[in-house]
């Protein structure tokens, strides 16, 4: 009886844990839908008054209709949001606006000052925002002077948490890890023959989608599972011979960390990624000519497992034949 009671309690605990995982993954979008009817603005604390006005204009601020209080990202706020040491000398110029979109609208990111966001592209921001748990929203980024743009998402985290979203530190870390990986790999390969930033962004979207599907069908993924999903996807997009082995390992490490995240439990995660993929492909001209856009990394993983299983069975049958 005690054993049955223990098993029942364990089952309830597992069910509650699963529900909490899904809730954590969808909480961000719920807050956006309920709170961001009016857009919210987060400005870098290093802006002068003139730069502040210039940035607000770029972001589309309208004082007569945008009545929510402006937020400021200070070094102290940044350290708390990002869980890093407080550095009072930190210069923060990147600013952002976030507003809700209809539930049928895809996630949008627009950089209003592309000449000043030197390292991060709109699609990189979109990929990282999906990892954070954003499904449909419009994010606008601007800066009055050249900056890398890697800290711009911190303003979004700040705004979301100030409005009640529970954003797990692990999800913020993953989004930042992804943003850094994408921007670094892009910068290091920008002028390399065969490299295409659109392919990298779509490949990463497929990798994340493949991880989510594989985890749903298999449960916890091994490092070998994750490595296969990454390597097969990069090969499909003809990036495996373009980016370096070290860069591939950076993507594998990110994918391995993501494979342990609750965000993969979100039912809308793969749909949001597919919307992102279709959006990039539709605007990429001939970048994806002769590329299999229906590639399924999870299916490739299943096929690989079936092949190994068949190979093992063939070996067993071979040795059995000697004993017959």
Residue ranges and their predicted role:
Residues 18-32:
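Sec-dependent signal peptide cleavage junction
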Residues 39-43, 109-116, 139-146, 190-193, ...:
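Second-shell loop/turn segments in exported
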Residues 130, 135-241:
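Soluble oligomerization/assembly scaffold segments of membrane-associated complexes
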Residues 35-41, 101-111, 133-137, 187, ...:
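Acidic/histidine-rich, surface-exposed loop or edge segments in extracytoplasmic proteins
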Residues 4-13, 24:
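Sec-dependent N-terminal signal peptides
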Residues 29-102:
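Extracytoplasmic strand-loop-helix segments at the start of, or within, the mature domains
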Residues 79-134:
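Signal peptide-directed extracytoplasmic domains
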Residues 1, 231-324:
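Charged, long alpha-helical assembly modules
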């Amino acid at each position: 009886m005690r054993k049955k009671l223990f098993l029942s309690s364990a089952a309830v605990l597992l069910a509650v844990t699963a529900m909490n995982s899904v809730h954590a993954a969808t909480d961000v979008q719920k807050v956006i839908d309920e709170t961001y009817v009016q857009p919210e603005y987060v400005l870098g604390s290093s802006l002068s008054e003139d730069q502040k006005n210039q940035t607000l204009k770029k972001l589309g601020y309208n004082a007569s209709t945008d009545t929510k209080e402006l937020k400021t990202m200070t070094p102290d706020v940044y350290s708390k949001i990002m869980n890093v040491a407080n550095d009072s000398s930190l210069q923060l110029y990147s600013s952002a606006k976030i507003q809700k979109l209809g539930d049928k609208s895809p996630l949008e990111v627009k950089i209003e000052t592309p000449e000043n966001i030197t390292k991060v592209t709109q699609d990189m921001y979109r990929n990282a925002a999906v990892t954070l748990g954003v499904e449909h929203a419009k994010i606008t980024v601007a800066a009055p002077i050249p900056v890398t743009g890697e800290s711009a998402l911190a303003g979004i985290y700040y705004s979301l948490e100030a409005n009640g979203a529970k954003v797990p530190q692990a999800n913020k870390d993953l989004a930042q890890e992804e943003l850094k990986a994408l921007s670094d790999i892009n910068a290091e390969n920008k002028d390399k023959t065969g490299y295409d930033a659109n392919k990298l962004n779509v490949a990463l979207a497929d990798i994340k989608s493949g991880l989510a599907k594989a985890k749903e069908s298999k449960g916890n993924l091994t490092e070998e599972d994750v490595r296969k999903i990454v390597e097969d996807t990069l090969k499909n997009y003809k990036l495996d011979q373009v980016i370096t082995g070290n860069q591939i390992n950076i993507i594998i490490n990110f994918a391995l960390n993501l494979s342990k995240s609750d965000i993969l439990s979100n039912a809308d995660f793969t749909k949001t990624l597919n919307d992102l993929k279709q959006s990039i492909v539709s605007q990429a001209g001939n970048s994806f000519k002769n590329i299999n856009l229906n590639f399924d990394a999870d299916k490739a993983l299943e096929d690989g497992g079936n092949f190994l299983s068949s190979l093992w069975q063939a070996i067993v049958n071979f040795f059995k034949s000697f004993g017959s």
